[in-house]
Regions:
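N-terminal non-catalytic cap/leader segment that marks the start of a structured domain
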Residues: 1-99, 268
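Residues embedded in well-ordered beta-strands
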Residues: 14, 130-134, 155, 204
Length: 284
């Protein structure tokens, strides 16, 4: 099932994509797509719905109908750095002995096709297509063997990054990762039953039609079950939390010479089975 949120920013309503690619309104069924709605029992009830019996929403999704972030009220957007060995190499860094964990502030989250703002003073804004893992059943100290039932579904995250803020200006990575609009999410949450193997998904990203990133989740260093277990040692995972699992090679700072995003350029990215995103870069 593909769960989504449609409408103007801040006024999104819950919806689902039907078999014909049209949006059906779930407002009479749930208040939004997030929190307890993502618990396993709640998702099972949504999957059992006859979507054809629900109101049809006018407009074509991602064209005449805006989609918002696919998860509402995200409590935590937890990111994993250097989780593809070939990306670590292009960044000139070693594969870490444990996952590199950082945060994206939830104020960075926007819809899949909303504009991305290049921050004032930025000279090194970059792109990163990533697989997002949406937590359904929360927990602490989750065993790796028990991790997958905690997943509600998957989505695309563009982990937009400002490399000077992130790397060159001391402190943690967070200030180069959490700028407003740096977390496009969606277009929809694909429930876990429709993604039999999250480690076998092709992913890509283009800038102005040029392919920069092309990879597969198969080359992750730390796989989804391990990441869930690992993170749960340090924090409670809660329904609606999102784990952004790292990016394959092809980011701007890894080019020779490096290239970075400029206002007026367009990013187009996707992951097999999870849809696509398109963002115009604008100056903040």
């Amino acid at each position: 099932m593909k769960l989504l949120r449609f409408g103007p920013p801040g006024q999104e309503k819950p919806g689902a994509l039907d078999a014909q690619g049209r949006v059906r309104d779930l407002s009479a069924v749930v208040d939004d797509i997030g929190g307890n709605v993502l618990l396993p029992a709640s998702v099972a009830k949504l999957r059992a719905l006859d979507l054809a019996a629900l109101p049809l929403v006018a407009g074509e999704p991602q064209k005449s109908l805006r989609l918002g972030p696919c998860v509402a009220r995200t409590g935590k957007l937890i990111c994993i750095g250097l989780n593809y060995s070939d990306h670590a190499a292009e960044a000139g860094m070693q594969v870490p002995p444990e996952p590199v964990v950082f945060n994206k502030w939830t104020s960075a989250i926007v819809g899949p096709d909303d504009n991305v703002e290049i921050p004032r003073g930025s000279v090194k804004t970059d792109w990163e297509v990533e697989l997002g893992v949406v937590i359904g059943q929360g927990g602490r100290y989750i065993a790796e063997a028990d991790a997958m039932p905690h997943v509600a579904g998957y989505c695309i995250v563009n982990d937009v990054s400002e490399r000077e803020f992130q790397i060159e200006r001391s402190g943690t990575w967070d200030k180069g990762k959490g700028c407003d609009t740096f977390g496009p999410m969606g277009p929809w949450l694909v429930t876990a039953d429709e993604v039999p193997d999250p480690q076998a998904l092709r992913m890509w990203l283009d800038v102005d039609g040029k392919r920069f990133q092309s990879g597969s989740t198969a080359t992750m260093v730390y796989k989804v079950p391990f990441l869930i277990s690992y993170l749960s040692r340090f924090m409670s995972l809660q329904s609606g939390d999102v784990i952004s699992t790292g990016t394959p090679p092809g980011v701007g700072m890894g080019q020779k010479p490096p290239v970075f995003l400029r206002a007026g350029q367009t990013m187009h990215l996707g992951i097999d089975g999870l849809g696509t995103q398109t963002q115009l870069a604008v100056q903040a």
